A protein has these predicted regions:
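Active-site-proximal alpha-helix that buttresses catalytic centers in soluble enzyme cores
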Residues: 1-68, 74, 117-118, 123
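Short, active-site-adjacent cap segments at secondary-structure transitions
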Residues: 48-49, 103-105
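Conserved beta-strand termini and adjacent loop/short-helix elements that scaffold enzyme active sites
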Residues: 67-69, 143-144
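Short phosphate-binding loop-to-helix
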Residues: 71-87
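Domain-level recognition of soluble alpha/beta enzyme cores
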Residues: 112-151
Length: 152
């Protein structure tokens, strides 16, 4: 019998791709003159906790926290409320969210008002400049649907 989704861990291959993608992302932030990651919010499930641990080693956020609003079944509105609250409380210049499908795809499509983006594979990521977490309230800066194809 398979491992329940909440307890499923990242594979060794997934950990490797994630570490490479995090390094590439960190380098991209520097090249683009974008702010360093200030806050990291992640779903309480095992693999997102593991992802957050790997990201924290590479991105060095000053604030990390589990966010129930990022667990499977959460709505885009819950994610938006989470972003609004984090921005009010911490005023981070850069917030990273680690969550699951379909929430990730829904939030990216909604906030960027773009329904035609390639879907993210596990470990894929997108970077948005969020003015407001509502439809069309963000500009897509970077889209990396496949973590095995590291963007430079």
């Amino acid at each position: 019998m398979g491992v329940h989704d909440e307890a499923r861990e990242l594979t060794d291959e997934g950990r490797q791709y994630l570490a490479e993608a995090a390094d590439a992302f960190s380098n991209w932030l520097l090249r683009e003159g974008l702010p360093a990651v200030g806050c990291l919010r992640f779903s309480p499930l095992t693999r997102t906790r593991q992802t957050a641990d790997i990201l924290s080693r590479h991105l060095a956020p000053t604030d990390m926290e589990v966010a129930a609003g990022l667990r499977p079944g959460s709505s885009s509105r819950e994610a938006g409320d989470l972003v609004s609250l984090a921005l009010e409380q911490q005023a981070p210049s850069h917030l990273v969210l680690v969550s699951h499908h379909p929430l990730v795809a829904n939030v990216i499509a909604l906030w960027s008002d773009s329904e035609d983006l390639a879907p993210l594979l596990p470990g894929g990521c997108a970077t948005l400049e969020v003015i407001s977490p509502v439809r069309g309230g963000a500009k897509l800066l970077r889209h990396q649907p496949d973590p095995r194809k590291v963007l430079v």
